[in-house]
Design a protein with these regions (language model features):
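Short, charged/polar micro-motifs that form catalytic or ligand-binding hotspots
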Residues: 20, 40-44, 90, 94, ...
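Short amphipathic alpha-helical interaction segments
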Residues: 41-65, 130-142
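Long, highly charged low-complexity segments enriched in Glu/Asp and Lys/Arg with interspersed Ser/Thr
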Residues: 251-275
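Short amphipathic alpha-helical interface segments
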Residues: 12-47, 99-127
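Short alpha-helical segments that sit at the start of domains
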Residues: 3-26, 86-101, 199-203, 216-218
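Long, charge-rich C-terminal accessory regions
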Residues: 131-244
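Short, amphipathic alpha-helical interaction segments positioned at domain boundaries
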Residues: 74-110, 165-193
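Accessory beta->alpha helical hairpin/"wing" motif in late/C-terminal subdomains of nucleic-acid enzymes
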Residues: 2-12, 61-90, 152-174
Length: 275
């Protein structure tokens, strides 16, 4: 068993490596804690998940009152973390992680899911192989903390696009996911990381406008067209798509909207089919 002093020494010793492999939300929360004198109000489930991760690292404590959830960073860690975040090696590694995350989000949008083994290999190849943060356990935790994930029946770990409802269906209908695309142009990769491809842009814009018209500007949701596109990627039938659309709208779909949905259904690449 560790003594309290030994636990504190271990936390301090691992601080640079742990800080290097924080997720984007965890890293932003640490910056906020430092800027706010060691206290930050937690807002939303993403920040709460990040706060719980910092608790497990023994960095922070959580305080819950009637109105707020407050995260506290002890003074003993504020100065060391502040210095670490300013180090050039930390900033360079975080910059490489940003490119890795963009590639991973693009791969997930193109494929729906991604082998964690391939993602881990890519993370080592592009970020960690020659760095001070070469720690496989932390690298795997980074992947799982920053993405939805799933274990198949064989125990293999996959990272998932957040819109994917049934990973087993993708594996059944399309085989193994295509993974990273090393020759993907940077502009295309950036758009894919934001859940849109250049060839999908026009239909997406038209569909958004038509949905706005049918739903009324006061009730229209910006994500509706995106949600329908993600649904089509998952091999739903035309009748299933139209059932969802009718449930969304206060009026029957117009001819223009139906025609646009036909284009969406015909030309949206399905996950697992590579077309």
């Amino acid at each position: 068993l560790y003594t309290l002093r030994e636990m504190r020494a271990n936390v301090l010793a691992r601080l640079p490596v742990e800080a290097a492999l924080l997720t984007e939300t965890e890293h932003a929360l640490i910056v906020q804690l430092i800027l706010c004198g060691g206290q930050a109000r937690i807002d939303g489930w993403q920040e709460l998940s990040a706060a719980e991760s910092l608790l497990r690292r023994l960095w922070c404590t959580l305080e819950v009152d009637e109105q707020d959830v407050l995260l506290h960073l002890p003074r003993e860690l504020m100065i060391p973390l502040s210095l670490i975040l300013r180090e050039q090696r930390h900033q360079e590694l975080r910059s490489r992680l940003l490119f890795f995350d963009t590639d991973t989000k693009a791969a997930l949008y193109l494929s729906g899911m991604l082998s964690a083994k391939q993602a881990l290999s890519r993370l080592y190849e592009s970020v960690l192989h020659d760095s001070y943060a070469n720690d496989e356990a932390l690298a795997l935790r980074y992947l799982k903390a920053g993405n939805d994930f799933y274990y198949n029946r064989a125990g293999e770990l996959f990272l998932l696009h957040p819109g994917l409802a049934d990973p087993e269906k993708i594996l059944r209908e399309g085989g193994f996911p295509m993974g990273y695309q090393p020759d993907l142009p940077s502009e295309r990769a950036l758009m894919a990381s934001r859940d849109l491809l250049p060839e999908e842009f026009e239909t997406d814009a038209q569909l958004s406008a038509l949905l706005d018209s049918c739903m009324g500007l006061e009730t229209a949701e910006e994500s509706s067209a995106h949600d329908l596109r993600i649904l089509v990627k998952q091999h739903v039938t035309w009748s299933e798509l139209m059932e969802v659309v009718r449930a969304m709208l206060p009026i029957p779909p117009t001819k223009e909207l139906t025609a646009c949905l036909h284009r969406l259904y015909a030309f949206t690449p399905r996950w697992g089919t590579y077309r």
